[in-house]
A protein has these predicted regions:
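Conserved Walker A/P-loop ATP-binding site and its immediately adjacent core
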Residues: 1-23, 38-45, 64-69, 141-147
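Conserved helix/coil segment N-terminal to the catalytic DExD/H
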Residues: 17, 43-100, 108-114
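Conserved RecA-like helicase motor-core motifs
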Residues: 24-44, 158-165
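Short, flexible loop segments at the rims of nucleotide/cofactor-binding pockets, characterized by
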Residues: 36-42, 111-115, 175-180
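Hydrophobic residues at beta-strand termini and immediately following loops
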Residues: 40-41, 63, 138, 162, ...
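Post-DEXD/H (motif II) to motif III coupling segment of the RecA-like Helicase ATP-binding lobe
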Residues: 88-163
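Conserved interdomain linker/interface between the two RecA-like ATPase lobes of SF2 helicase motors
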Residues: 151-153, 159-182
Length: 182
């Protein structure tokens, strides 16, 4: 399974729906349809989803940084203090069920980033408690010192960094005068 950390609940819900409607909904051995992706976080209404995650029923699990970084002891500054959720992720790791952790909007990790969030800074717990699982940090807006801060925070060893030009010839802006304002 792949775990995708993202800050935007509505976007994650849209991505889960799109994945399940296109790639997902394969027929299981009992003749029913199964989803391949799910969302875990405060916006999740179905309380059985988390149990299904830990039974390995999904290929892609979208979570908020708060879900990952929450500690049962919120007053501890240690990244080794873990939540029940993190302990359950460790069990999945032990069973070789987690293949990748992807962190979207990774610029939120850096205090220098334009959308800094404390819960993102705490994602260092992933490297500490789930060693050996590849971590991919994704952002479209990180300058060099923010990328360095992301690498340092997530304890990425010799990361491959792919950058591209900000010139996007495939995008354009057009302005049209609106004559009728009604």
């Amino acid at each position: 399974m792949s775990i995708v950390v993202s800050p935007l609940i509505s976007l994650m819900q849209d991505q889960v729906t799109a994945l399940n409607n296109t790639v997902g909904n394969s027929i299981d051995r009992d003749g029913g349809k199964t989803d391949i992706a799910c969302f875990l976080g405060s916006g999740q209404i179905d309380k059985t989803v988390e149990e299904r995650v830990f039974r390995g029923e999904y290929k892609i699990v979208f979570v908020t940084p708060e879900k990952i970084s929450f500690r049962d002891d919120e007053f501890s500054s240690s990244t080794t203090s873990s939540s029940v959720f993190m302990q359950r992720l460790q069990s999945l790791k032990t069973m070789n069920k987690i293949g990748l952790i992807a962190i979207d909007e990774a610029h939120c990790i850096s205090q220098w980033g334009h959308d800094f969030r404390v819960s993102y800074k705490r994602l260092a717990v992933l490297r500490d408690q789930l060693p050996g699982i590849p971590i991919m940090a994704l952002t479209a807006t990180a300058v060099k010192h923010v990328r360095e801060d992301i690498s340092k925070t997530l304890k990425l060893n010799n990361p491959y960094i792919a950058t591209n030009s900000v010139d996007r010839p495939n995008l354009r802006i057009q302005c049209h005068r609106k004559v009728d304002f009604s």
